């Protein structure tokens, strides 16, 4: 059935007939890579395998695309190992071509038969796929022009890259009938429920260290009325305490200035001055030298706050009680260190015990949820792998990749 997005509708795999068609599928197989080129976390590849298998089972010939890393960085590698893993997880033999739009790639795509699949190499080998431009502009580019001539349909299965306006994300929907893949569909449906449904109250818990994005999200959620409560943790909580005039150790204020800049600090101050409903931690777990203390928020004169304290956990737990929807994005502390993991774990437990529909955003939650007892972990509504796309969604900004699918549904009369 069609999927609602920002007042429009896009097609899903349930709305299109793929039998006998050559389908370009843009996955996001981008994964952490070790020094030897080995893939350290293949969860995105495993997730993509289901969609690839479905399309092949339904009689499509699948041309898979993805990026990996950024040019000149250590994780900018070929997708050959990705193809091997995609084959293993999907049960489909996925051929690999060390080419994207050259003669070998085009010959392979042209000869592909129903039920077969090929993964072309890293799309960012092509400079067009590292340029931000409108979809109608990218539709005239070399990558989209060459590949679309050999295909009948396009599927976006890269929700986590859909905040980018790059050729392989936004160009194809303007020249080929296009639909959202299963992972993208699940992300949008879950986030629509979390943000756009009439279920109230909605509580959003924001932590982590991405201050510019977090302040933009707080600004949108608190001004639009989307969230009934915004609870801040991590560096985000410290930023809003700083905006309220709390004295913080110099090392902390320098970090806030470095991570957020004057713009984020000024915006946080404006939000505070307008009296919006943004809650901040009331105590912290603080590391001072080789010792650890619990300190109230108004006594942070030395050391480095590494986690929220027990009083904050109880304060925020009370705010979650009775919520119908809870969204958590970013950790409450430095969870890589077991000593500073408790705040995040306890908030996750509180959310799952509340009876609310819960959405967790960020890869760090995967490990935490895996360690919880089954009676709690089974209550997870949705674990988003959206990354930057999730931040865009929560801040009310349109996702170019999804908007292009809405446009395609209209252009090709798909829904």
Curated annotation (Swiss-Prot):
Q: Which InterPro entries match?
A: Phosphoglycerate_kinase, Phosphoglycerate_kinase_CS, Phosphoglycerate_kinase_N, Phosphoglycerate_kinase_sf
Q: What is its main location?
A: cytoplasm
| Keyword annotations | ATP-binding, Cytoplasm, Glycolysis, Kinase, Nucleotide-binding, Transferase
Residues the record lists as binding ATP:
336, 362-365
Locations listed in the record: Cytoplasm
Query: What's the domain of life for this entry?
Result: Archaea
TM region(s), chain numbering: none
What EC number(s) is this enzyme filed under? 2.7.2.3
- Any one annotated GO CC term: cytosol
Q: Which residues bind substrate?
A: 28-30, 44, 67-70, 124, 164
Q: Which PROSITE patterns match?
A: PGLYCERATE_KINASE (PS00111)
- Pathway field: Carbohydrate degradation; glycolysis; pyruvate from D-glyceraldehyde 3-phosphate: step 2/5
Q: What is this protein called?
A: Phosphoglycerate kinase
């Amino acid at each position: 059935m069609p999927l609602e997005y920002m007042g429009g509708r896009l097609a899903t795999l349930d709305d299109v007939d793929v039998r006998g068609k050559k389908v370009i599928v843009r996955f996001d197989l981008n994964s952490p890579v070790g020094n030897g080129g080995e893939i350290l976390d293949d969860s995105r590849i495993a997730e993509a395998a289901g969609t690839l298998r479905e399309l092949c089972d339904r009689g499509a010939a699948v041309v898979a695309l993805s990026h990996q890393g950024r040019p000149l960085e250590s994780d900018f590698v070929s997708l050959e190992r990705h193809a091997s893993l995609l084959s293993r997880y999907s049960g489909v033999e996925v051929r690999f071509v060390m080419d994207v739009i050259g003669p070998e790639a085009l010959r392979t795509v042209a000869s592909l038969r129903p039920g077969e699949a090929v993964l072309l190499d890293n799309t960012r080998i092509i400079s067009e796929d590292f340029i931000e431009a409108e979809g109608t502009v990218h539709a005239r580019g070399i990558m989209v022009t060459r590949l679309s001539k050999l295909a009948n349909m396009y599927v976006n299965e890269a929700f986590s890259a859909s905040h980018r306006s790059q050729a392989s994300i936004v160009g194809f929907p303007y020249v080929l009938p296009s639909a959202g893949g299963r992972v993208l569909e699940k992300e949008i449906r879950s986030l629509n429920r979390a943000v756009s449904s009439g279920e109230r109250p909605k509580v959003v818990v924001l932590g982590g260290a991405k201050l510019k994005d977090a302040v933009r999200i707080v600004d949108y959620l608190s001004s639009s009325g989307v969230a009934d409560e915004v609870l801040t943790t991590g560096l985000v909580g410290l930023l809003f305490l700083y905006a309220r005039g709390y004295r913080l150790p110099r090392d902390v204020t320098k970090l806030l200035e470095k991570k957020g800049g004057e713009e984020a600090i000024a915006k946080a101050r404006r939000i505070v001055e307008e009296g919006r409903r943004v809650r901040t931690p009331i105590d912290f777990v603080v590391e001072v030298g080789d010792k650890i203390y619990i300190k109230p928020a108004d006594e942070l004169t030395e050391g480095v706050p590494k986690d929220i304290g027990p009083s904050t956990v109880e304060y925020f737990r009370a705010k979650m009680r009775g919520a119908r929807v809870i969204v958590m994005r970013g950790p409450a502390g430095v969870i890589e260190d077991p000593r500073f993991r408790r705040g995040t774990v306890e908030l996750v437990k509180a959310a799952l015990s509340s009876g609310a529909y819960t959405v967790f955003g960020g890869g760090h939650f995967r490990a935490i949820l895996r360690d919880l007892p089954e009676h709690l972990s089974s209550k997870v509504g949705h674990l988003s792998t959206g990354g930057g796309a999730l931040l865009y969604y929560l801040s009310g900004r349109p996702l170019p990749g999804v908007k292009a699918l809405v446009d395609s549904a209209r252009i090709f009369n798909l829904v």
